[in-house]
A protein has these predicted regions:
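Single conserved hydrophobic/aromatic residue that forms the stacking wall/gate
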Residues: 158-170
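Short, positively charged patches
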Residues: 1-136, 140
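Phosphate/pyrophosphate-binding betaalpha-module
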Residues: 135, 139, 143-161
Length: 170
């Protein structure tokens, strides 16, 4: 659990893009090493601006501890890129998520059908209803539903994990 705190710390740093986090992880063995690195220890990382590197001086773990507490309370699991269960289907894309949040039964990601949901942030009530119904039916049939949980269509799908007992991954 302690190491997981540093993964959450890294992913919740405001102003640091996912790509920047991936670049840092290419230079450091773990987020914990990034956390404890002194500014002079940071190598020049191509694609990481000095203002982004300065964000790493925020050593507060309050956000991370809050996220971990909410995950524990909400029965939400987390998978880091270094976890054996992290899906190869994601690991091998250009800009994979550093950390996955999931709810429901932990699937065998690379062996099960998955459907990804991408949609508008401003949607009609009909659009939300249609996405929820489609996601529900797919999950009921056994598909893993993957959503970025952004505002709008994506976020509407978090509710389907409970009745279907299937996973929703963000």
């Amino acid at each position: 659990m302690a190491a997981l705190k540093y993964w959450v710390w890294l992913t919740t740093l405001p102003g640091l893009t996912n790509r920047s986090k991936l670049l840092l992880l290419e230079h450091f063995p773990s987020p914990e090493d990034i956390y404890y690195a002194q500014p002079e220890d940071l190598p020049p990382v191509e694609g990481l601006s000095s203002s982004q590197a300065a964000l790493l001086s925020d050593k507060s773990t309050d956000r991370a501890e809050d996220v971990l507490a909410r995950c524990a309370k909400g029965d939400i699991f987390l998978l880091t890129m270094q976890d054996a269960l992290y899906p190869d289907r994601l690991r091998n894309i250009y800009d994979p998520p550093v950390l996955l949040y999931g709810r429901g039964r932990m699937p065998l990601f690379d062996e099960e059908a998955a459907v990804s949901v991408v949609g508008t942030r401003t949607c009609t009530p009909y659009g939300i209803s249609a996405a929820e119904e489609l996601g529900y039916q797919l999950a009921k049939e056994g598909a893993v539903v993957v959503s970025g949980l952004a505002k709008g269509i994506d976020l509407s799908l978090i509710h389907i994990s409970e009745p279907t007992r299937r996973v929703v991954i963000s």
